[in-house]
């Protein structure tokens, strides 16, 4: 009996270790990349960072291939693959560190997430959904310095640890139900204003059906609900009410919409 118990214990430990390695591989690891907590009074600034990253090439591509509704001309990106690859190589050649300001880190990680997502679609185009690709968020497709991160690693291992819920409305997963892809690059000099705009636009868009008593929200508020529990709140209502044109009652019924994973492509 003791031998069986010991074997059982070993199996449990082995399973736990294996699960942890899978968890890391599943896109939750930051691969040691630096993160900083965003202060409550975040301001946009380029003056307090050891590095100022040039995102102008990405800005030019976005203005050319993304419309104001956030729909993407992936055929156009495919034609401009060289310019896109040059920008990706620039980002990947950099190694963020603690001397970077929180503003530069936010802009860098948001842009690299969005740019590599576009590149992933272009690589597999034509497709109907990002979910048609094997492991889009779990494979190490994003080289940063000597490391290779997954898109999930950037989102879960870095951006979500920065104590900034608004990142959920800045990163784009190439799908209809995602917050729209801005047709401008995020920059340290405008980061706070850009995050505010992205958050307000998404909450007041048709991705959410907001009313005082019965509200149907994007699944983002279900999947990442704890990220929106700020100032001691235990639900998402208070956070949404900061931005919503319609105030939700504290005891309102909250439901969540099905997510549309169809490609956010210009028609």
Residue positions per predicted region:
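Positively charged n-region of N-terminal signal peptides that target proteins for export
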Residues: 1-6
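Sec-dependent N-terminal signal peptides
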Residues: 7-14
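C-terminal motif of bacterial Sec signal peptides marking the signal peptidase cleavage site
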Residues: 16-19
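Interaction/scaffold regions that mediate signaling and macromolecular assembly across diverse proteins
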Residues: 22-99, 103-108, 115-267
């Amino acid at each position: 009996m003791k031998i069986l118990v010991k074997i059982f214990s070993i199996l449990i430990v082995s399973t736990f270790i294996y699960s942890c390695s899978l968890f890391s591989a599943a896109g939750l690891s930051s691969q040691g990349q630096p993160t900083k907590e965003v202060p409550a009074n975040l301001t946009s600034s380029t003056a307090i960072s050891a590095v100022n990253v040039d995102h102008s090439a990405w800005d030019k591509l976005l203005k050319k291939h993304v419309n104001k509704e956030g729909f993407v001309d992936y055929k156009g990106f495919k034609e401009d693959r060289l310019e896109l690859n040059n920008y990706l190589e620039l980002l990947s050649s950099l190694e963020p560190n603690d001397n970077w300001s929180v503003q530069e880190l936010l802009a860098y990680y948001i842009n690299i997430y969005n740019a590599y997502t576009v590149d992933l679609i272009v690589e597999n185009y034509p497709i109907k959904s990002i979910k048609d690709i094997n492991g889009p968020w779990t494979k190490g497709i994003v080289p940063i310095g000597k490391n290779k991160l997954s898109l999930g690693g950037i989102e879960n291992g870095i951006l979500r640890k920065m104590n900034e819920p608004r990142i959920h409305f800045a990163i784009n997963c190439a799908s209809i139900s995602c917050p729209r892809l801005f047709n401008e690059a995020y920059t340290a000099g405008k980061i706070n204003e850009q995050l505010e705009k992205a958050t307000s636009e998404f909450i007041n868009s048709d991705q959410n059906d907001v009313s005082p008593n019965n509200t149907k929200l994007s699944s983002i508020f279900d999947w990442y609900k704890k990220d929106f529990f700020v100032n001691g709140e235990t639900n998402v209502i208070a956070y949404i009410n900061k931005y919503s044109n319609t105030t939700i009652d504290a005891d309102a019924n909250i439901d969540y919409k099905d997510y549309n994973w169809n490609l956010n492509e210009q028609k």
